Design a protein with these regions (language model features):
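Catalytic cores and adjacent flexible loops of soluble metabolic enzymes
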Residues: 2-322
């Protein structure tokens, strides 16, 4: 039987750059009901940047009545207003949120809607068409801002908690609508329920890259670890040519509007998986784990990290190995 190595299995796609996007300060914090002190949020974000994270979602400009945890977003944005160490983004639900982001000096926003009608209604109480109309308003609001970035997260791009498997035709239709409005955006396909398999992720991420979209459109993947597939699915997306991968330190959070979809993929788990890959994440594991420990200590925080359970002495020894 001929011998093979990892490179024979995964091919040259293993050697393109990887960009880790940290979403715990937004996607994670919003899953905690009790208010987290603003000072603690800022210190955690600072710790993540110090650990080497260079892209972070630091919160959302949403109604404090809808998401009370984000009521202090103006204070957090004010603290990081002039910070050039990392790309900092915020989620916005509408043009007003985009305007607030601009007012507070942020240069990157994230807009989310679901491919699935049922999930979009459950999540934001709008039809998909209404959400696309909202995206048009957001794009209009930022149209005169130079060097302003927008990312669109397509929730339920693989599976819907209410309707089951989402057909690729629905994903393609959503992408076409998005790129018509924002040809230079980054589009993230989100495994909202965490039920996608690595094979499904790889197939779909390859398929979207074959679509006739503007060359300025780029791709990302946002997975959940609900079924234990978080790292495997992120790697499948990477092997399909996707270099931008979302994670949350300590595996904090999930989708509050997708029943059972707990657990973002833990940043530390994915960073460990990239050891010896030939693609550096630039993240210091020791520093990252300290921040993950602090996140896990937040009252009512539901975390899902594997690496945090490994004895630190054993982890340090492994990190020293070539």
């Amino acid at each position: 039987m001929p011998s093979c190595c990892l490179e024979d299995i995964i091919g040259d796609t293993m050697h393109h750059p990887v960009e880790i996007v940290e979403v715990a300060p937004r996607d994670g914090f919003q899953s905690i009901a009790a208010p987290i002190p603003t000072k603690a949020k800022i210190e955690i974000i600072e710790g993540l940047i110090d650990a080497g994270l260079r892209r972070l979602e630091i919160g959302s400009f949403v109604s404090p009545r809808a998401v009370p945890q984000m009521a202090d977003m103006p204070d957090i944005a004010r603290h990081f207003r002039s910070d050039s160490r990392a790309r900092l983004s915020v989620l916005v639900p509408n043009a007003k949120g985009a305007e607030m982001a601009m007012t507070h000096g942020l240069r990157e926003i994230v807009y989310v809607f679901s491919v699935s009608e049922a999930h979009n209604q459950n999540n934001v109480r709008q039809s998909v068409q209404q959400s696309i109309d909202g995206l048009a308003n957001v794009v209009s609001a930022i149209s005169n801002e130079p060097d302003f970035r927008i990312r669109v997260d397509l929730a339920t791009a693989f599976d819907c908690p209410f309707d089951g498997a989402v057909p690729f035709d629905a994903v393609r239709a959503a992408i076409e609508r998005v790129t018509d409005l924002a040809p230079a955006c980054e589009i993230a396909l989100c495994d909202t329920t965490g039920r996608a398999t690595p094979f499904a992720v790889q197939e779909r991420m390859r398929a979207v890259q074959r679509l006739a979209v503007p060359p300025s459109c780029t791709w990302a993947f946002h997975g959940h670890d609900t079924y234990g597939m978080g790292v495997a699915n992120a790697f499948a997306a990477y092997q399909a040519g996707i270099g931008v991968l979302d994670v949350a330190a300590a595996g904090l959070g999930g989708c509050p509007f997708a029943p059972g979809a707990t657990g973002n993929t833990a940043t530390e788990d994915l960073v460990y998986a990239f050891l010896n890959s030939g693609s550096s994440t630039g993240i210091d594991m020791g520093s990252l784990l300290l921040v993950a420990d602090r996140i896990a200590a937040i009252p009512d925080a539901k975390v899902a990290s594997h690496l945090r359970n490994v004895p630190r002495a054993a982890m340090q020894e492994r990190m020293r190995q070539p």
